[in-house]
C-alpha cells in the first residue's frame, strides 16, 4: 500500500494541494476524479516523483514506486519524429529484464504489421494514446498510474482499453487513474477519490457512494392549452 500523509503543494503562494491524506491499496483500482484544475495531475506527478511537495510524507510499504515495478501514462502523449512503433517497443524492452512479447504488444495496441512499421508521430491521436499505454505495460508493472488515459480515443478504442484494464485487474495489478468519464469510474473503480480545490472531498467505494447519495426531485408546473 502507498500512503500519503498531509501532502501539501503550492505554486506562487497558490495552494494546489492542501493536507492530502489517502491510501492507494494494493491490488485495487482507484479512480481519482475532479474538475480541471482540481490538482489531479499535480498529485500524480508527486506520487511518481516528478514533482516535489512542500510538506507531508509518502510511505511506500510495498515498494511499488520502484521504477521497475511502475508503469506510467501521463496526460499528454508525445513521440519523437522518425522513430517507428516497433523501434519504440524494442527500446522499452531493453529497459527491463522481463517484458511483454511482440505478440502481446500487438494485442494491446491492435496494430497491424503496417502500423508497427509506421512512425509513431504519424499515428492518429487515439492510436498514439493506446501506443503510449502499451509502452507503459512493456515491463509488466505491478503498479499502473494513468492520467486521463482514454483522452483522444474513440468509443471502440475506449472499450478495448477497459477490456485490457479488466485483465490487469484479474492479475492483481494496482491501478490509479484519473478520468472525466463517469461510466469508466462506475465500471472499473474499486475506490473513488474526489479532489476539489486541492482537497480530498470524497474517498469511498462506488457502491457506498451510490447508497449514500441523496437525490432531489424538482417539480416544474406546466400549463397546457387545449
Residue ranges and their predicted role:
Residues 162-226:
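ABC transporter nucleotide-binding domain
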Residues 144-148:
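Catalytic Walker B motif of ABC-type/P-loop ATPase nucleotide-binding domains
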Residues 49-68:
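Conserved ABC transporter NBD signature motif
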Residues 33-35:
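The feature captures the beta-strand-to-loop junction immediately N-terminal to the Walker
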Residues 133:
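Hydrophobic anchor residue at the start of the ABC signature
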Residues 119-123:
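Conserved ABC ATPase signature
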Residues 2, 17-19, 67:
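Conserved structural motif at the start of ABC-family nucleotide-binding domains
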Amino acid at each position: 500500500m502507498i500512503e500519503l500523509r498531509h501532502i501539501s503543494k503550492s505554486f506562487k503562494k497558490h495552494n494546489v494541494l492542501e493536507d492530502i491524506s489517502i491510501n492507494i491499496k494494493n491490488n485495487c483500482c482507484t479512480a481519482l476524479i475532479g474538475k480541471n484544475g482540481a490538482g489531479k495531475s499535480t498529485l500524480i506527478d508527486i506520487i511518481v516523483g516528478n514533482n516535489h511537495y512542500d510538506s507531508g510524507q509518502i510511505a511506500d510499504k510495498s515498494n511499488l514506486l520502484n521504477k521497475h515495478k511502475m508503469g506510467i501514462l501521463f496526460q499528454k502523449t508525445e513521440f519523437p519524429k522518425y522513430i517507428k512503433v516497433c523501434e519504440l517497443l524494442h527500446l522499452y524492452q531493453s529497459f527491463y529484464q522481463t517484458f511483454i512479447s511482440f505478440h502481446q504488444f500487438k494485442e494491446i495496441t491492435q496494430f497491424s504489421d503496417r502500423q508497427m512499421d509506421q512512425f509513431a508521430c504519424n499515428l492518429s491521436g487515439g492510436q498514439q494514446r493506446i501506443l503510449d499505454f502499451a509502452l507503459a505495460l512493456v515491463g509488466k508493472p505491478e503498479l499502473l498510474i494513468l492520467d486521463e488515459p482514454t483522452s483522444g480515443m474513440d468509443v471502440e478504442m475506449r472499450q478495448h482499453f477497459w477490456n485490457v484494464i479488466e485483465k490487469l485487474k484479474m492479475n492483481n495489478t494496482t491501478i490509479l487513474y484519473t478520468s472525466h468519464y463517469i461510466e469508466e469510474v462506475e465500471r472499473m473503480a474499486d475506490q473513488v477519490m474526489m479532489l476539489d480545490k486541492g482537497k480530498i472531498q470524497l474517498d469511498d467505494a462506488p457502491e457506498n457512494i451510490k447508497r449514500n447519495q441523496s437525490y432531489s426531485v424538482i417539480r416544474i408546473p406546466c400549463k397546457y392549452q387545449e
